[in-house]
């Protein structure tokens, strides 16, 4: 019986060890020196277990073998979980565009069949091709080919006609535009109700990068959205991009530059079906992540290699899983109700934050004279705190909770093999990354002689926007170039050496 038990134990250990090695090689995250160490460790265990069974030390050998089997199983479970998370992060790159058919909230209609005799309209300025496709579906479902879709180019005219409810009784619009219109027309999203929704999915058409991330500089676009449900589907949906960070990374010098562009920046964006016009940067996200990427590439004259979409609401669980983070605040402030139901107070300098505090820190803007500019800097500071904690040895003791949290808040087109290369780079080197930050500056005042901004893509007039300074954009371009060229420097020290004349500082792009 003892011999049979020993043989069964040996078979079990060989099977688990084989699965462990398979997972390790499949993940490809361990540098060569660690692979050699793992194989040597397993070989020694089996040699000791084999030889000790013929000696008086076989009991000690069995005890050690059981302990080592536990270690092997633990490592196998870790590697399996990491493999599962990486596969989840690399879901097919699909954008989901939702089109709504809306009527007034107090309308008696409760289904599409009730709209057979309604007058439909849409805003041709802000809509993509899916809106007309959705209306074709409406006509088909109602079996009324004679239905017409009235065209409006101005939201002022369309909303006025809709509220009057004579010439327009139903609007066909992209779901992502509801919040945009509500920002200009108070409570628009609560004054309407959705009768029908249509979903249209398409593959993201971002060009694949061939950069060698172990040796060559590369650029990642970080897009932050707010989704209360935290579902994977929300990350793939077209939505406003509240956080827009360009991360320039040089693996040779271990430097990262995070450049924040304010969400309300009035710049030329890529809109529906590739159309371009001056609008808010955040609105580009309504037309897919590739529209935001194209917008920032044109603004800075760069090629973005990869993107990461983050559910900022989900950052709560990630920060908590990390055991909290340290955020270095530029200013002292207390956040208001819009940012958090709890009035968290932050001091100038380091602040130890849990998940709720970190999100509140990132959301607040009304407490600052600089408004959206300071919020952008705060968001960058929070991401810097997450990166510093995530690349520290402390994460090893919290791997399970971190992996669980990360899997539901990130969506990326970074290939698993590239992520493996980055992990191997960090494991083989071990040195800390030097994370630098820079935020685009600007003004909310329009240029002399110009009236309120007109948003050419979304068709809104008089919106509150940010006019970026041309010199601030140029400085960001210089900093990105320095990182890519391998220069090792401190951003604050470099900026203090730049002399900017008053006219140049106030020129707008």
Residue ranges and their predicted role:
Residues 1-8, 12, 498-509:
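Single conserved hydrophobic/aromatic residue that forms the stacking wall/gate
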Residues 7, 33-37, 59-66:
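Alpha-helical transmembrane segments of integral membrane proteins
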Residues 9-50:
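Membrane-embedded alpha-helical segments of integral membrane proteins
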Residues 51-59:
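Membrane-helix interface "capping/anchor" motifs
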Residues 58-80:
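Internal/C-terminal transmembrane anchor helices
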Residues 79-92:
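Aromatic-capped interface at the extracytoplasmic side
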Residues 89-90, 94-95, 103-105, 111-113, ...:
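Non-catalytic, solvent-exposed segments at the cell envelope interface
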């Amino acid at each position: 019986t003892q011999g049979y038990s020993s043989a069964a134990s040996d078979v079990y250990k060989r099977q688990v060890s084989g699965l462990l090695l398979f997972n390790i090689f499949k993940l490809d995250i361990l540098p060569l020196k660690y692979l050699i160490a793992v194989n040597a460790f397993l070989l020694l265990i089996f040699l000791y277990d084999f030889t000790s069974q013929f000696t008086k030390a076989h009991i000690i050998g069995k005890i050690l073998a059981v302990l080592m089997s536990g270690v092997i199983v633990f490592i196998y479970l870790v590697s399996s979980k990491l493999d599962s998370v990486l596969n989840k992060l690399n879901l097919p790159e699909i954008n989901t565009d939702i089109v709504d058919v809306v009527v007034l909230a107090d309308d008696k209609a409760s289904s599409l069949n009730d709209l057979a005799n309604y007058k439909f309209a849409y805003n041709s300025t802000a809509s993509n091709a899916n809106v007309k496709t959705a209306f074709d579906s409406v006509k088909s479902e109602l079996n009324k080919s004679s239905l017409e879709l009235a065209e409006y180019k101005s939201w002022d005219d369309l909303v006025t006609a809709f509220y009057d409810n004579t010439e327009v009784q139903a609007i066909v619009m992209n779901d992502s535009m509801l919040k945009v219109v509500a920002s200009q027309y108070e409570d628009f999203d609560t004054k309407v109700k959705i009768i029908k929704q249509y979903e249209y999915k398409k593959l993201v058409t971002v060009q694949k990068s061939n950069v060698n991330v172990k040796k060559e500089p590369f650029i990642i676009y970080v897009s932050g959205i707010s989704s209360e449900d935290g579902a994977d589907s929300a990350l793939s949906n077209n939505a406003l991009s509240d956080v827009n960070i360009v991360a320039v990374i040089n693996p040779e010098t271990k430097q990262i530059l995070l450049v924040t562009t304010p969400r309300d920046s009035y710049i030329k964006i890529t809109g529906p079906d590739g159309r371009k016009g001056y609008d808010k940067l955040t609105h580009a996200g309504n037309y897919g992540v590739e529209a935001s990427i194209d917008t920032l590439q044109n603004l800075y004259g760069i090629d973005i290699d990869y993107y990461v979409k983050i559910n900022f609401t989900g950052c709560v669980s990630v920060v908590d899983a990390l055991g909290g983070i340290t955020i270095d605040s530029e200013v002292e402030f207390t956040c208001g109700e819009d940012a958090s139901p709890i009035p968290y107070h932050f001091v100038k300098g380091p602040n130890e934050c849990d998940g709720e505090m970190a999100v509140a820190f990132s959301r607040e803007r009304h407490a600052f004279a600089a408004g959206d500019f300071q919020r952008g800097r705060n968001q960058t500071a929070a991401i810097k705190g997450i990166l510093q904690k995530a690349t520290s040895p402390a994460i090893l003791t919290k791997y399970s909770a971190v992996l669980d949290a990360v899997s539901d808040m990130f969506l990326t087109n970074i290939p698993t093999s590239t992520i493996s290369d980055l992990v191997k780079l960090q494991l083989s080197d071990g040195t800390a990354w030097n994370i630098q930050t820079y935020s685009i500056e600007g003004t909310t005042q329009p240029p002399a002689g110009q009236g309120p901004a007109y948003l050419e893509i979304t068709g809104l007039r008089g919106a509150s926007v940010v006019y970026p300074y041309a010199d601030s954009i140029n400085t960001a371009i210089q900093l990105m170039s320095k990182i890519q060229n391998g220069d090792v420097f401190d951003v604050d020290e470099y900026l203090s050496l730049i002399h900017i004349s008053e006219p140049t500082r106030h020129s707008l792009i």
